Swiss-Prot record:
It comes from Chloroflexus aurantiacus (strain ATCC 29366 / DSM 635 / J-10-fl). Pfam families: Fer4_NifH. This is Light-independent protochlorophyllide reductase iron-sulfur ATP-binding protein. Homodimer. Protochlorophyllide reductase is composed of three subunits; BchL, BchN and BchB. Its cofactor is [4Fe-4S] cluster. The keyword Iron-sulfur applies. It catalyses: chlorophyllide a + oxidized 2[4Fe-4S]-[ferredoxin] + 2 ADP + 2 phosphate = protochlorophyllide a + reduced 2[4Fe-4S]-[ferredoxin] + 2 ATP + 2 H2O. Disulfide bonds: none annotated. [4Fe-4S] cluster binds at residues 97, 131. Belongs to the NifH/BchL/ChlL family. ATP binds at residues 12-17, 41, 182-183. Binds 1 [4Fe-4S] cluster per dimer.
Length: 273
């Protein structure tokens, strides 16, 4: 059976860059990994492959949405460290339902029988959980992961995601494996002081601290993982992903989170320092 991870976080928080480097780190430790981008922008796997690949919705459209006419080779590409990649895609901006496409992608994966082929499957899911379609990966995941920064908007979104995971856990096996702190800045951004307090309050922990570093920005522009980059700070940037990969591959200590009510999170964060 595959270890299935669903990664969420506020829009623009760095989910795709983080997911790609985490997938690469697990692959470098010997795991066979599939990363699935669940965003109409279809750029989740760009750091792994160096290009934008055909999406599931593009391929389905070309065969008039007959699933039986689609093969694995039509939608899956292999990127850095042997990580297989797939992009669900979505409808044109301003039309259709992206959640429907996520559901169709999951259906296609089940048709292919891919859950038995991989050691790890990573769902990189867009923004906040805004509808049932985008929460679909939680129906299949062993663990949810939340990416967040040390600021109010990010923590507010993380709390909403904790609520989604808590609700899904009532009918499915999914639990929260932890929070990944991104763009950690100890000089000007408070490090992870707010995130640490939030994690403790909702019953989880910060499992990784990814620094705010220019090498990460440049890796995204280059369409590469951090492991392929050269320059100052490489070890500082790759170490958190190596540590998180070890943690996740070794059956993490997961919990069902206990999120705040929306009004309560406003009041709580205002008193944190």
């Amino acid at each position: 059976m595959s270890l299935i991870l669903a990664i969420y976080g506020k829009g623009g928080i760095g989910k795709s860059t983080t997911s790609a480097n985490l997938s690469a780190a697990m692959a470098l430790k010997g795991a066979k990994v599939l990363q699935i981008g669940c965003d109409p922008k279809h750029d989740s796997t760009f750091p792994l492959t160096g290009h934008l690949q055909p999406t599931v919705i593009d391929v389905l459209d070309s065969v008039n949405f007959h699933l039986e006419d689609v093969s694995k080779e039509d939608v899956i590409r292999t990127g850095f460290a042997g990580v297989d990649t797939l992009e669900s895609g979505g409808p044109p901006a301003g039309s259709g339902c992206g959640g429907y496409v996520v559901g169709e992608t999951v259906k296609l994966l089940k048709e292919f029988g891919l859950y038995d082929k991989y050691d790890v499957i990573v769902f990189d899911v867009l923004g906040d959980v805004v509808c049932g379609g985008f929460s679909a990966p939680l129906n299949y995941a062993d663990y949810g992961l939340i990416i967040a920064c040390n600021d109010f908007d990010s923590i507010f979104a993380a709390n909403r995601l904790c609520l989604a995971i808590s609700q899904k856990s009532q009918r499915h096996k999914v639990k929260l494996a932890g929070i990944i702190a991104n763009r950690v800045d100890y000089e000007y951004g408070g490090g992870t002081n707010l995130l640490d307090q939030f994690a403790e309050k909702v019953g989880t922990k910060v499992i990784g601290r990814v620094p705010y570093h220019d090498l990460i920005r440049r890796s995204r522009l280059a369409g590469k993982t951090l492991f392929e980059m050269e320059g100052p700070g490489k070890e500082e940037c790759t170490r958190p992903f190596e540590e998180m990969a070890e943690y996740l591959l070794a059956q993490p200590q997961a919990t069902v989170p206990q999120p705040y009510h929306d009004r309560a999170i406003f009041e709580a964060i205002g008193g944190w320092r």
